[in-house]
Structure formats: structure tokens, C-alpha cells
């Protein structure tokens, strides 16, 4: 159901990318995401135990490099996938932007779709810095990392509808988020409002994820969207749980602290 005919300019590495091999590899290996998740969980609990009796590591320069690398990657990903999605919206409409599988195998976006799902494994490295620097590790952080890895690998192999929206939104939010982390790690003073904006962007992303899932479900009934009920169920459960957790985090981190500050004054 690839009805996308793009006139967007491709870079040479995007042209040379073999999406068929990538999709086949993911179909054969997507379950390895469970192994990565198990190793990640083991590292979290083992690492925190080992660090209990050790002094924290500074790791400022490695953290700047790490965050900056992910920021640049996310910025390019957001620009390229965003260009694709805007083109489809302008020329084909909303339904096509949600249901078109061309995001996985079409020009421009095919490379970035695969890069996105693969990046969810190395992004687990965010937690290494938190543990080694003995910072607070909240449930939302590691739950989000594990579930995004599992779901993105699980969905990419089937080229399910909605993926273009999910990936483009995530690229966009991460472009801002990792840029913020890089600035903070480099010692720049960044307004608290910037952090609030990022969390609000994440909440908006989760709301949009729920809306996209609803549209996929409705259009799937008329054989206009390629997906299956099991995928929509897990995706909806994931996005709803994120929505609740990010709203709770926003209230605790910003609204609650504002109220405490007001009372103290």
C-alpha cells in the first residue's frame, strides 16, 4: 500500500540504504530487544548496588559528548522525517499520513525509520550516566526506555500504520530534550521554563500518540490502514501509561514545587 511518490531531495546515503534487508533483519531479530531490556534491567539494579559504597563519577565531558551526539542525530532525524510527513500531509492528506507504509520503505524516510528503531538500544546508555553519577533514577525513566525499545522493534518488522507520526514526534521531542541535556552538562544555566516546555512537549506527544492509535483503529476497520488489533492494544496501553506518568511527573516536578515555594514565602 505504498502510494507515496515523493519529489523530496535524497542524500546519497539515503538512496543507498537497503530497506528490504533492514526490515528482514528486524523480522528475524526483533526479539533480541527482550535480551537487551533484561541486560539493561540487570545493570540498573546491579549498578545501583555497586555504586552504593562508591563515590560518584563526574563524567561531565563524556555526558556532554553523549547528549550532543544524540541531539544532532535527533535534529537531523526530525528534519528529514518531518519533511516527509509535511509533504504527505500537504499532498495526500491526514489519512494517508497515518496509514501510508511508505514511511518505512520510501525515499528520504526509510533510512531514518530504521535508524530510529536501532537508536533505542544505544539510548539505554542514558541510564549509565545516571547510575555512575549517583543521580535519582525514577520509574518513568527506565520504564520508558524499555517499552520504547520493545515496541519500536516489534512494530517496525510489521511496518504498521502510524509509525511515521510516532517516530517523527519522538525525533522532534528528543532533538530539544538532548540539546537541553547537552547545555546543562556543559555547565550552561538554562531556564526552568525550558525544562517545563520539554515535559509539556512530551505530554503532547503522548496525547497525539493516543489520537493516532484511535485513527488507525477506525481506518483499519475499513481496510485502509495496515495494522492489527494486538499492536494497537499494546501501543495504546503504552501511550496511555506514558501520558499518566508524564502528567504526574509534571505536577510533582513543577506545579508541586511552585506551591511549596509559594507557601514558604
From Swiss-Prot:
InterPro entries cross-referenced by the UniProt entry: ELO_CS, ELO_fam, ELOVL6
Enzyme Commission number, as recorded: 2.3.1.199
UniProt modification remark: N-Glycosylated.
Regions annotated as coiled coil: none
UniProt keyword annotations, A-Z: Endoplasmic reticulum, Fatty acid biosynthesis, Fatty acid metabolism, Glycoprotein, Lipid biosynthesis, Lipid metabolism, Membrane, Transferase, Transmembrane, Transmembrane helix
Protein role: Catalyzes the first and rate-limiting reaction of the four reactions that constitute the long-chain fatty acids elongation cycle. This endoplasmic reticulum-bound enzymatic process allows the addition of 2 carbons to the chain of long- and very long-chain fatty acids (VLCFAs) per cycle. Condensing enzyme that elongates fatty acids with 12, 14 and 16 carbons with higher activity toward C16:0 acyl-CoAs. Catalyzes the synthesis of unsaturated C16 long chain fatty acids and, to a lesser extent, C18:0 and those with low desaturation degree.
Name of the molecule in the record: Very long chain fatty acid elongase 6
Disulfide links within the chain: none
Glycosylation sites: 2
Activity regulation remarks: The reaction is stimulated by the presence of HSD17B12, the enzyme catalyzing the second step of the elongation cycle.
Membrane-traversing stretches: 34-51, 70-90, 111-131, 136-156, 159-179, 197-217, 232-252
Single GO BP term: fatty acid elongation, polyunsaturated fatty acid
Domain of life: Eukaryota
Subcellular location: Endoplasmic reticulum membrane
Enzyme class: transferase
The keyword Chloroplast is assigned to this record: no
GO cellular component: endoplasmic reticulum; endoplasmic reticulum membrane; fatty acid elongase complex
Catalytic activity: a very-long-chain acyl-CoA + malonyl-CoA + H(+) = a very-long-chain 3-oxoacyl-CoA + CO2 + CoA; hexadecanoyl-CoA + malonyl-CoA + H(+) = 3-oxooctadecanoyl-CoA + CO2 + CoA; (9Z)-hexadecenoyl-CoA + malonyl-CoA + H(+) = 3-oxo-(11Z)-octadecenoyl-CoA + CO2 + CoA; dodecanoyl-CoA + malonyl-CoA + H(+) = 3-oxotetradecanoyl-CoA + CO2 + CoA
Transferase listed as a keyword: yes
Record pathway: Lipid metabolism; fatty acid biosynthesis
Molecular function in Gene Ontology: fatty acid elongase activity
Membrane-protein topology: Multi-pass membrane protein
Family affiliation: Belongs to the ELO family. ELOVL6 subfamily.
Amino acid at each position: 500500500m505504498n502510494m507515496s511518490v515523493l519529489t523530496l531531495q535524497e542524500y546519497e546515503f539515503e538512496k543507498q540504504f537497503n530497506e528490504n534487508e533492514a526490515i528482514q533483519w528486524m523480522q528475524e531479530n526483533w526479539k533480541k530487544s527482550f535480551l537487551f531490556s533484561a541486560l539493561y534491567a540487570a545493570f540498573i539494579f546491579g549498578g545501583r548496588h555497586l555504586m552504593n559504597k562508591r563515590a560518584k563519577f563526574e563524567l561531565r565531558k563524556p555526558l556532554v559528548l553523549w547528549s550532543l551526539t544524540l541531539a544532532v542525530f535527533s535534529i537531523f532525524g526530525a528534519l528529514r522525517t518531518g519533511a516527509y510527513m509535511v509533504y504527505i500531509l500537504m499532498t495526500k492528506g491526514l489519512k494517508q499520513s497515518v496509514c501510508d507504509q511508505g514511511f518505512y520503505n520510501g525515499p528520504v524516510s526509510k533510512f531514518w525509520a530504521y535508524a530510529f528503531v536501532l537508536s533505542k538500544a544505544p539510548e539505554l546508555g542514558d541510564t549509565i550516566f545516571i547510575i555512575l553519577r549517583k543521580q535519582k533514577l525514577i520509574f518513568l525513566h527506565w520504564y520508558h526506555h524499555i517499552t520504547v525499545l520493545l515496541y519500536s522493534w516489534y512494530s517496525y518488522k510489521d511496518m504498521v500504520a502510524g509509525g511515521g507520526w510516532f517516530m517523527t514526534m519522538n525525533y522532534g521531542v528528543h532533538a530539544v530534550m538532548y540539546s537541553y541535556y547537552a547545555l546543562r552538562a556543559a555547565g550552561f544555566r538554562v531556564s526552568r521554563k525550558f525544562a517545563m516546555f520539554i515535559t509539556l512537549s512530551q505530554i503532547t506527544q503522548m496525547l497525539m500518540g493516543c489520537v493516532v492509535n484511535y485513527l488507525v483503529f477506525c481506518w483499519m476497520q475499513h481496510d485502509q490502514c495496515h495494522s492489527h488489533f494486538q499492536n494497537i492494544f499494546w501501543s495504546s496501553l503504552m501511550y496511555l501509561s506514558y501520558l499518566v506518568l508524564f502528567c504526574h511527573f509534571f505536577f510533582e516536578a513543577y506545579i508541586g514545587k511552585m506551591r511549596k515555594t509559594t507557601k514558604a514565602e
